[in-house]
């Protein structure tokens, strides 16, 4: 690609073939133009020039290759065919220009095998010092055919392979020897996996060869271009376009000015890189290569670095080029799909670039001394690609792979960097690798890289073209392109999944891509998605039909991968889709065995069948936990590091380029302070210093992410150490052998940014880089010698340090991506567990003191970290001591940093923390040194942390240390702009605390987590306990982790995880403390997160899921994992709420057929982690399913306390109702979840809110403790439990009918579930007929039981009544249903009579008739049941007492039953109404009144409902209506039925028909009023309604009771609130009327019968306005009056008679405008209300005609009763006449109440049914429930009680206390009169 000669300038005559050109020679000046237009030409797109500037070699001479290149372009397809036909690349083809096409194709094929590309060829003849190209090909001819086969199959275009990483040209290794004429050329050797190993091709380019070389390069490029035209080249085309943007000059900066060109193909770099990954043996560079590299001018190195930083550097351009290549190489590990180019991972790009650069390292191993040769494994490409994965699975999966890859790069890197300009190939190769993330992330970056274009416009055009074309290409991807497999057997779906391109995966699946196609190594796309924790991608694959249990290599399933890598969400997704958690791989381990995190284990256990759980647990218990930990550590670091790094660089690539660079710049003070430290430190070593600077710039330019890493490495001495260790940390076990040196030597962790695919490799790469660097070795080697021992302590401290530093850098870069950073830290911690890097750290720290104070903080951090590590490695106690001191100093430093950096660099403090972690890994010696340094620094900056320091002083040293650490983190968190990072740190911190709390205190959450895992040992546990204690106070003191639930979760986890009781307690305490302290930090983090999220927006969805997974997998410590998740989730919640709350809302809130969201399902399963994840992802916590249930309902029903807390924190409404009005509190109480109920009550749940059944939570409670809890929160219990039950039963139907009335009216075939009992609900799915028949049958059974039930005492009677009322309620509902269905059928019949002769309507009609008969039978039985209870009451010696004790509802129920029977019978036989005994009916009526009084609102609703129904009903409907009203109201039905029976239906129908319209209005009013009454109407209103209703009922019996009732109810009801007033005015009348009823009842059975219905009707009417007054009058007034009434006067004077009396007698019926008063001027009309009052057109209500006339005639006018009654006419007849016609005249209304009261005792008979009801009503009135203003007037002593009732109870006493008083009054016999 590049030629060794440096291009003199960027002239347009560069030999790069960038545009399609005809065979004719083109002017050199046309090339740039072609290049610009390259993007526009589709054919051109596929072309790209691998060599940046062959012209430079020719020095201005156009290369003949250009023509050839153009020719190739002109006929790309033909050339492609030729390429396919070329089995072997021969020297002749290369030498012959006419065969250039084939030659290029062959080269491309060879490149496919070997990513290495020999940049310089002579056109006429390349002189190969060792072998001709033909030789190597001959040696491995089979490789070429294989490549051709691949190409022919469309698997991979040769250009892809060319870019891939092995150069076919070099069979085993390509060694480019420096010619004598030129400086040692840079030799790029890429192992040729396809060719036999150990075959070397050495190409020596002389100055003479430059022209030929150019032409050959051109030819090669053209061949590549032609190959790019392959269908797969769509992705690659992007790369080539990018390449076209690059100047060859950049690509090939000659190593020297000599003409000889070094052939260092990008492919060779990538190949070397891959080979290195594959072959760990290639760690050492050959001596020759090292010499050659060393010869490279250092100035160039610096310059190159500088360029990178600048952004216009070769690296940047090379990166672009490299990206292009990688795109073509999409099949390769390091390469990405064209879609991947879009992947925003600048860090990945840098990583690739670095890797590519490092790929030169392969040259060092197994190369002939004469040439730099890469010893490439003979494994197939797929093996190469997958070998990393296999290694990862075995050792650390990707860790080893990355180790090799990184090792060599690290070694080579310094020199490569030095030679970067010289060897443009290196940079191009580097760029090539980097291309994936960087370019993909930003097409714009391509343009940036193509700085070679002097014209920025041209660059922009190229970008636009490439972007547009890329989109078009994606859309145009064909199915065969998707399913075409590359050399590794990977199709496009696989590659897209590998790079977490969910959109591309979706597109491919949509196009028909095979989601289950395995690669040659046996892995599928789902495996890759699971390994990387790519939730979206995995979800898309599963949606596309991916086999969730598909087996990969070694029988590993995706679930294994997800669990081993700690990807919780992905694992849960797999489990939800049927993954088998017990499936075992070849090692005999199932996913559950691989899980080391408690959350993950719990997740898996939930999906294990119960019968298998015991076996599984037993098996797992048999495994040595230590072994498991070790295995897990190996695996986890691999995965975690990989996933974390991947995640980080993904986010970083986007943000780092966008924001990270800025952040780094902004945080230069902190990050760069470290850098300065490093710089100063490195100044001793000029190379290092230069490199550090240049590297930093370079990293900044290349990848903000890598820059951050590099920065950290370069900036902080510890960072270089740390950074190296960071890389090492990931593969610490792998790097143990020599990585300490590498780490120490490597300031270039920047390079550590591994290929986009495997960040682990990046780490390894970084580690190796130090080895490679000769610059750093001087400095780093010294510490490395120290660190070797420490590294080999079992955990490479250097590795750890590297990981940490790397994480640090990532964090700095990823300020916005704190989560990613956290993951990285966790990884690093895992890998950095062993602090074996003390030497480096010591060295750094020692020099840190020299560094500025800012640097010192970093040093302190590092020191602290090192100390901590050494503690872990060596002794916990010494560590504690050192740690305490160091920590204190560090705290002060951290505080300083945080204070100083908060403004600019939040990341700085965080970095410092990271450094600290790394430092902890240093040896104990260094710890002491650090201590000293820290002490000094401590003095300097600890003052800021005096408080924390005080805390520390209060605590023991360990405590102090941990505390200081907490402040550090705290400071870091605050200073750190990225909220996510902070939360992660905190989470890790806490996690570590849970494990070894001291770890967290050290500030290295990840390391601490791992350490904690290991320290679970007994002695370590004790240490941990101490740390935990320390942390407790620090946490209390410091608001760190921003998660409230963390403490609960942590406590939970701790309980399970902690092997130590002490540790467990400590954790718990600490968690609790943390909860309070967390919030401030979370808030700060939140604000910071908002800033960072701007950068993250594109990747937020992916990052969220990935971050969560990464967090889970990264923390070795289960506790730490969960804590991290929790903190992340909470912070994410805030984050999402702040900026992108609804990003995933669409998917997350997606519902199933039942309307349930994922959150509903997760809550029902009790999956707390998933619930948190969903909430954090923006799930709607108040989303109702189809039945109205919310997640809080589900959690309350299950009693899941933790989930309830989570939901409430997320904003769940505590008083949300379902369609039946059921609250979460009802569910918790009904299921006896005491704790859940308490939490709900604490959060504002209303204990008095009732459902549609009118049951409150207290009514649902069966447990005394639950009742007490509810009462303590103000729950009010009904005065009488039995009454309340009865009332509830009566109310429920009314409310339900009210709510679902439309269902009944509109559709007779549907039964409203709310109106049915629970038994009915269970049958809702059945047909209407079957349901109703089943209900009736069930009722019959219950009735039989009641008939056999023996009533022995009042308790039995109460139970009996309760059951009777339930039956009655059901019957009412059935009756309403019957009625609605009948009406529906009648309408249909009127529309089409013929339709009933056949078909469904006829069957429906027959069913209706059958059910009607059954209902009649049931009604008769119900009447018997009601008579039974009545007889029992009559028999009792103390009927009053029995009535009292048996709540009036019992009477009511009996009354209802009898009435219901009556109504039912009336349906069948309207005229023959079965009348219950007069006494019985009266009792029922009175009882019903009492019940209404007690129930108040309930009765009102029911009665109003009944009234409505009555209005709806017609003739027969009236009886049914009455029945339905009774059904709904319970009492109303009986009253209607009784009245109907007496009046007989015929009379009723007329009345109803006459007032149909009115009744309908009344119904509407009733509905509205019912609701109002439920909330507003008090008992007085009920009483009023009862009386008025009674009056109306009497009138109704006489004439048209239903009609009257409706009218009165309407009139009373219309005013709603005004009704109360009106009724209160007429309440005395109502009382007298009730007395009159009673008197009538005594006088005669007919009257009694009438009275009974009246009373019943009054009960039903109670809902209307008069309800309260009537009930009160009928209650208190009636009882007193009844006692006096009969004796006082049986035949009162005429003037004493009132309209209400006439209504009771049936002579007058209520109605609208039926009373008239004529004057000369006009006629005044008034309406008669049910309560006997008059209502005029203006709406004003008068008690009687006298008051009406007084108002009309004037206030001063005197109007006598005779005058008024003689002048006011009713239906044209004076009222006085109706009075004269009356034989028995009722007492005068005004005097009746008082007169009757004294007389009642004389007349009253206990056996008298009338008297009994009166007593019961009186009792109710006495208690104030039935009292009203009327009763107040009649009995002033109750006035105050009434007032109290009218006012809310809360104004006087708590509801539950008042309820107790009322209950006492009811039960107390002494209070009865």
UniProtKB/Swiss-Prot annotation:
Keywords, sorted A to Z: ANK repeat, Chromosome, DNA recombination, Meiosis, Nucleus, Repeat
All residue ranges annotated as the RAMA domain in the record: 1683-1778
A GO CC annotation given for this chain: nucleus
Keyword Ligase found: no
Compositional bias of kind Polar residues: 361-379, 1460-1482, 1515-1525, 1621-1632
Basic residues biased stretches: 728-737
Chain spans, region Disordered: 1-27, 361-380, 707-740, 1242-1263, 1449-1482, 1512-1549, 1606-1634
Chain positions of ANK repeats: 488-517, 521-550, 554-583, 1154-1183, 1187-1216, 1220-1249
Keyword Repeat annotated: yes
Family matches, as InterPro entries: ANKRD31 (IPR042334), Ankyrin_rpt (IPR002110), Ankyrin_rpt-contain_sf (IPR036770), RAMA (IPR040843)
Any GO BP annotation: positive regulation of meiotic DNA double-strand break formation
Residue ranges with Basic and acidic residues bias: 1250-1263, 1535-1544
Subunit annotation: Interacts with REC114; the interaction is direct. Interacts with IHO1.
Function comment: Required for DNA double-strand breaks (DSBs) formation during meiotic recombination. Regulates the spatial and temporal patterns of pre-DSB recombinosome assembly and recombination activity by acting as a scaffold that anchors REC114 and other factors to specific genomic locations, thereby regulating DSB formation. Plays a key role in recombination in the pseudoautosomal regions of sex chromosomes.
PANTHER family attached to this UniProt entry: ANKYRIN REPEAT DOMAIN-CONTAINING PROTEIN 31, ANKYRIN REPEAT DOMAIN-CONTAINING PROTEIN 31-RELATED
Protein name: Ankyrin repeat domain-containing protein 31
Native organism: Homo sapiens
